[in-house]
Regions:
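A conserved beta-strand->alpha-helix junction
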Residues: 1-12, 70
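Secondary-structure boundary/capping signal
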Residues: 3-4, 63, 105, 232
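N-terminal alpha-helical segment
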Residues: 5, 78-81, 193
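Classical nucleotidyltransferase
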Residues: 12-124, 147, 208-214, 218
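Phosphate/ribose-recognition catalytic cores of enzymes acting on nucleotide-derived substrates
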Residues: 62, 114-233
Length: 233
């Protein structure tokens, strides 16, 4: 896209009638729309009173092209929608979410300092991303890729609250820990990072001691390497 216009959603904006919505969003502030493409069932305006029939009539009046798009479905017949994508992610169904998105789901954030458990106790240095409220898959271990400084690295990822170390640190905020498996040299602190989630391995769980967790991490890494072999980095 050459430009993106962000509109602040307010009560006044939500109360606009469809006609007001068209004028304020498509024909004001230097914007004069030439064509509009929306989903066939898209609704807008107060009380969702605007629809594709209204837009088709308005397009003739204002002289812009209007292209309604039919619903897209998965091969199993499921309608592809933001609601369906959120549900797939909440259930940890990354394959379905990726099919509907047309790409693997990613999380983004700036690498911050963690508790150093992975480095000091597990010999497995990680990059930590604090997870804000939003659309997140279930806590657990994932195979994926870390994108940083224009490069893509295979990575083992853990989303969760590090239950094995909770007795030592008390409450631990939910975070994504990434262990880059190959090729990266240097420090990640302060860098903006994209975590591309490819496959869910197992739920997060509490281990009796760090040594048990360390053994499981090695098993996880072996499995993750097998999963990511089919991808070219």
């Amino acid at each position: 896209a050459e430009a993106v216009i962000s509109i602040h959603f307010t009560k006044e904006f939500a109360a606009q009638a469809p006609d007001e919505f068209i004028e304020s969003c498509l024909f004001s502030g230097g914007v004069e729309v030439k064509g509009l493409c929306v989903g066939q069932k898209w609704r807008f305006g107060a009380g969702a009173s605007g629809d594709s029939v209204f837009l088709e009539r308005k397009a003739r009046e204002k002289g812009f092209a209007f292209v309604p798009v039919d619903e897209l479905r998965t091969p199993e017949g499921m309608i592809i929608s933001s609601t369906a994508i959120r549900k797939a992610l909440a259930e940890g169904n990354l394959d379905l979410a990726a099919f509907m998105l047309g790409r693997n789901y990613s999380l983004f954030g700036t690498v911050e300092e963690g508790y150093h458990n992975a480095t000091r106790k597990l010999d497995s240095p990680t990059a930590n991303l604090h997870m804000m409220a939003g659309i997140l898959p279930p806590n657990g271990v994932y195979a994926g890729f870390a994108h940083v400084d224009g490069m893509r690295y295979p990575a083992a990822m853990n989303l969760g609250v590090s239950p094995t170390f909770r007795a030592e640190y008390g409450r631990i905020d939910r975070r994504l820990e990434l262990h880059l498996l190959d090729g990266f040299r240097g420090s990640l602190y302060g860098k903006y990072l994209q975590a591309e989630l490819v496959s869910f391995l197992r739920p997060e769980r509490r281990f009796a001691n760090p040594e048990e967790l360390k053994k499981q991490i090695q098993n996880d890494i072996e499995e993750i390497n097998r999963i990511l072999e089919r991808y070219h980095v």
